């Protein structure tokens, strides 16, 4: 097998608690042709010193220190822009995650054997359970259309692209634009997959190759509290859905997801005791996405949710428990320095116009 260069990146803010474990996991790779860029986002907890110590020990490691604090997705995109011009693959590892020793070797092996593959995933250990079990062994290469359709059409919970630490990207995809993660939402890594799998295949290695640490300090608590993920998924469905679904399928999925979004808001309106920030956020996002929030939609969603709960109480409780138990948060927390807030979900990549009437 050829040994193409892999550029590994770790964007980090105040990651001193686990950064050494992360870096050591890269150093222990059985695949040796890599370089490693750590982008320190104005950390205040010793992160910089840890990274610089390792950079002095191994010349494949370099540390880039931001002059100003960036929001979390912007820092990821800066890291992607810093990959080597000679690299063929790009591997991200979050600062509180780590890689198993064969991670780079197994992923490169699949990529080299299948030139059509642009993104490569694998099983991942998330705390005490294995994630991303929805692919069917022994098939290793899936068309981008096949994978994205399955997700947009409501694939089972165990099916998905993976988290940033569990994926490897072909470097040519990363270099296609200024921002590899195409929007500032907590779902941006998934958006990147939807975007780039329009013209490439998805590969999957049936081996646990990475570990994702999930704990209170790493969850993007503000995004979790506001539930930014519903609007981010609806954004992806509007923007990328037409590439993978026919008109009827797209209309059905848009209707289903908007109704689900409205039910979520209805429940919070009557029992959630949400503050003004919550309502301002969702009103603005729905307006941007072409589905203006209105009281009639809220009342309809409330009535539907109530009827479902009365007629099928077991189902309602089960759905609620499933949603609470299996929510996945995409990005690691990056608290803002005093006086500086991270950016919201303003659509930077393109302005979305209202969907056609037949899709509402």
State what each model feature region is.
Residues 86-96:
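Short beta-strand-to-loop acidic/aromatic patch adjacent to the donor-nucleotide binding site
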Residues 102-135:
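Conserved donor NDP-sugar-binding/catalytic core segment of glycosyltransferases
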Residues 66-85:
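Glycine-rich, basic loop-to-helix element that forms the pyrophosphate-binding segment
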Residues 14-28, 34:
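Short, well-formed alpha-helical segments that are part of the catalytic scaffolds
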Residues 141-233:
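Conserved nucleotide-sugar donor-binding catalytic segment
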Residues 25, 32, 40-49, 68, ...:
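A conserved acidic beta->alpha catalytic loop
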Residues 3-6, 27-38, 46, 59-62:
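Short loop->beta transition adjacent to catalytic acidic/histidine clusters or analogous donor-positioning motifs
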Residues 268-360:
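Membrane-interface aromatic/basic loop that binds lipid-linked glycans or pyrophosphate carriers
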